[in-house]
C-alpha cells in the first residue's frame, strides 16, 4: 500500500505564527522529535526562519545558530530529517551533518547555488511556489510554469527527478481566491512527474475554511480535512504541526484509496 508521508514541523524560532518559542532550544526540540516519532512522523522539517506575515529577516549567522545545534542533536534519530532554508550555506552545513532533504521556500530562486549543493550531497529537495504576488497569467498556470522550470534546473544540476518534490505554496504570494483555485486543481500538479508535498497546516486558508476567527491550534481538524482532500488528489506527503491527527487520518485515507483501486482492478 502506498503510504502518504507525514512531515512534522519543528520550528526552532522565537516568532513562528503557530508555535514560535516552544522548541527553540535543543532539549525541547529533542523531546518534540521523540513525540512526533511516537505519533507516526516520517520526516522532521527543521526551520530557523519564521515565514509569518510581517516577520523580520534573520541573518545567516542567526539562522545557523538556531538550526545547527538542533540538527546535530536529532540527526541520529531513526527518521528522515529535512531543513527548511533558502540559503545554500545553511543547507550545506546541515547536509554535512547528515540531513536527507532541503525544503526551499524559494525553489532555488533566492540562492542559485542551492541545487549544486543538494546534488553534491545526493539529497532530496522540495521546491515551493512563491513570488511577489504579481503575475501575468492565472495562478495555476504560473505555478506550474515556475515550478517545472526550477525542477528542470535542479535536474541539470544533477538532482534526479525522484528526489525533487513540488509544493504549491499555499499561504505564499496568493490571494484567497488563488489559494482556493490551487487547491481545486492540485491534480494538475500531481500529474507532473514529481511527487507533491501539501503544506496547509494552521494557515490562513484553513482559518477561512472555517468562516470565523480561530487560533492556529484550533485549525487542526480543518487542516486534517485538507490532508484528506490532498491525498485523494494524489499528493504524496503533507507538512503538519499535529502529527498524530494527520498520521491517523492519512492511514485511513490510504487504506480506502488502496481498497478502491484494488476493487476497480478486479472489475
From Swiss-Prot:
Q: What are the EC numbers? A: 2.5.1.15
Required cofactor(s) = Mg(2+)
Q: Which PROSITE patterns match?
A: DHPS_1 (PS00792), DHPS_2 (PS00793), PTERIN_BINDING (PS50972)
Q: Which Pfam families match?
A: Pterin_bind
Give the residues the record marks as binding (7,8-dihydropterin-6-yl)methyl diphosphate: 51, 84, 103, 167, 203, 239-241
Catalyzed chemical reaction(s): (7,8-dihydropterin-6-yl)methyl diphosphate + 4-aminobenzoate = 7,8-dihydropteroate + diphosphate
Q: Give, as one word, the top-level EC class.
A: transferase
Q: Which GO terms describe its cellular component?
A: cytosol
Instruction: Give the pathway.
Output: Cofactor biosynthesis; tetrahydrofolate biosynthesis; 7,8-dihydrofolate from 2-amino-4-hydroxy-6-hydroxymethyl-7,8-dihydropteridine diphosphate and 4-aminobenzoate: step 1/2
Question: Which family does the similarity line name?
Answer: Belongs to the DHPS family.
Oligomer and partners: Homodimer.
Q: What does this protein do?
A: Catalyzes the condensation of para-aminobenzoate (pABA) with 6-hydroxymethyl-7,8-dihydropterin diphosphate (DHPt-PP) to form 7,8-dihydropteroate (H2Pte), the immediate precursor of folate derivatives.
The name of this protein is Dihydropteroate synthase
Amino acid at each position: 500500500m502506498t503510504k502518504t508521508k507525514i512531515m512534522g514541523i519543528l520550528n526552532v524560532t522565537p516568532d513562528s505564527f503557530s508555535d514560535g518559542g516552544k522548541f527553540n532550544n535543543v532539549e525541547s526540540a529533542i523531546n518534540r522529535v521523540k513525540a512526533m516519532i511516537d505519533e507516526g512522523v516520517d520526516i522532521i522539517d527543521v526551520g530557523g526562519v519564521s515565514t509569518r506575515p510581517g516577520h523580520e529577516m534573520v541573518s545567516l549567522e542567526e539562522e545557523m545558530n538556531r538550526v545547527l545545534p538542533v540538527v546535530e542533536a536529532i540527526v541520529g534519530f531513526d527518521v528522515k530529517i529535512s531543513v527548511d532554508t533558502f540559503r545554500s550555506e545553511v543547507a550545506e552545513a546541515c547536509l554535512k551533518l547528515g540531513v536527507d532533504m532541503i525544503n526551499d521556500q524559494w525553489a532555488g530562486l533566492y540562492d542559485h547555488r542551492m541545487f549544486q549543493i543538494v546534488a553534491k550531497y545526493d539529497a532530496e529537495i522540495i521546491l515551493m511556489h512563491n513570488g511577489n504576488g504579481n503575475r501575468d497569467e492565472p495562478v495555476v498556470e504560473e505555478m506550474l510554469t515556475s515550478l517545472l522550470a526550477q525542477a528542470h534546473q535542479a535536474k541539470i544540476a544533477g538532482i534526479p527527478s525522484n528526489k525533487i518534490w513540488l509544493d504549491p505554496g499555499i499561504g505564499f504570494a496568493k490571494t484567497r481566491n488563488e489559494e482556493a483555485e490551487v487547491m481545486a486543481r492540485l491534480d494538475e500538479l500531481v500529474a507532473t512527474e514529481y511527487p507533491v508535498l501539501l503544506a496547509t497546516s494552521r494557515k490562513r486558508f484553513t482559518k477561512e475554511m472555517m468562516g470565523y476567527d480561530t487560533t492556529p491550534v484550533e485549525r487542526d481538524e480543518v487542516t486534517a480535512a485538507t490532508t484528506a482532500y490532498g491525498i485523494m488528489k494524489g499528493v504524496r506527503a503533507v507538512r503538519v504541526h499535529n502529527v498524530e491527527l494527520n498520521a491517523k487520518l492519512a492511514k485511513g485515507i490510504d487504506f480506502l484509496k488502496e481498497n478502491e483501486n484494488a476493487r476497480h482492478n478486479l472489475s
